[in-house]
Amino acid sequence: MDKQKRETGSEIMVVTGEASGDIHGANLVRALKEKDSSLSFSGMGGPELASLGVEILYDAKKISVVGLVEVFSHLPSIFAAKKILQRRLKNKPPALLIIIDLPDFNLMLAKKAKALGIPVFYYITPQVWAWRSGRIKTIGERTDQLGVILPFEEEFFRQRGQAASYVGHPLLDNVSIKLSREEFLTKHRIGPAAKYVGLLPGSREKEISALLPDFLRAAKRLQDECSEKISFLLPIAATIDREQLLENGLAEYQDLLDIHVISEDRYELMACCDAVVAASGTVTLELAILEVPMLVVYRTSPISYWVGRKLVKIEFFSLVNLIAGREVVTELLQDEVTPERISIEIKELLYGAKGVAVGKGLREVHGLLGEAGASAKAADLALSMI
């Protein structure tokens, strides 16, 4: 529907619960505003959405969790968010509800919206092709249009009777390098080294406590086994303070390693690295776009892992390998995540033929992701629903 046919000043509610969803949601809102400046926005999100003038009805950080078990401690916040957002849907119905990722919460909210006659656009759908496929029917009943971001998802949903459109991956709009390697190193006072290795344990407290100690032990082992200097780069997300890093091993290792904790220039940091060990998640696609050789790891609570094994029906857990349809990067899962194994794999990426092979595979994955412009395409889909 074009702007002339839409009611001027329509409100759109945008709901997301992850840091990555906040970024993708902000890019979508920005694209919507460029196409129709009269639109207003409310919803649940974080600082990126807030910076665009979105009325934040509930701070997404309060319900951001990792793993099945960890959800229980956040139930009061989840119910509070549900109550506030459902009340807003009823008392001031938006022209459109846009839900981003966060499937269990968002599908609950979508049910309320549909009951009120509010159209629902699901941008960045859950990975139902991997696990909990029973949600496919629920998604169809509670949404009107899907904007999918992985190449194979459009056909997957359409074969099951869903209105789905592939818009491309939004990371292609985000990932850009503004500083050269030399400029980045100079800016952050990082001295010369033979190799630079990235330690990316995730952006949540649970991930960091589960992975950072072993990342640091692996770094020490790697440095001890190599005759040349290695510098380690540790990006810190806005959701994490330095004290949490110190409590999870940094205090012990910061004097034993040449390690640099950096809170900005995220993509420049990644591009600077000769190899990276990263927690499974969106960051692996960012690294793939930058074509940085990586080792991907995942560890959760024993109960969450046990439940996940019963539900997940895929060969790989990293997005890079799932998109490629084969093993491009090595994956370490649960008890496989040890300092010894990490150091061995990183050494192979740095000094063996494996680094070249992984780089070639990542170029293929980068190409499979398509072209930039996901936010603009998603905005067109959203506006067609109002």
Swiss-Prot record:
Condensation of UDP-2,3-diacylglucosamine and 2,3-diacylglucosamine-1-phosphate to form lipid A disaccharide, a precursor of lipid A, a phosphorylated glycolipid that anchors the lipopolysaccharide to the outer membrane of the cell. Its EC number is 2.4.1.182. It comes from the Bacteria. SUPFAM superfamilies: UDP-Glycosyltransferase/glycogen phosphorylase. One of its GO terms (biological process) is lipid A biosynthetic process. InterPro entries: Glyco_trans_19 (IPR003835). It is an enzyme of class 2 (transferase). Keywords: Glycosyltransferase, Lipid A biosynthesis, Lipid biosynthesis, Lipid metabolism, Transferase. Belongs to the LpxB family. It holds the Pfam family LpxB. GO terms for cellular component: membrane. One of its GO terms (molecular function) is phospholipid binding. This is Lipid-A-disaccharide synthase. It catalyses: a lipid X + a UDP-2-N,3-O-bis[(3R)-3-hydroxyacyl]-alpha-D-glucosamine = a lipid A disaccharide + UDP + H(+). Transmembrane segments: none annotated. Pathway: Bacterial outer membrane biogenesis; LPS lipid A biosynthesis. It comes from Desulfotalea psychrophila (strain LSv54 / DSM 12343).
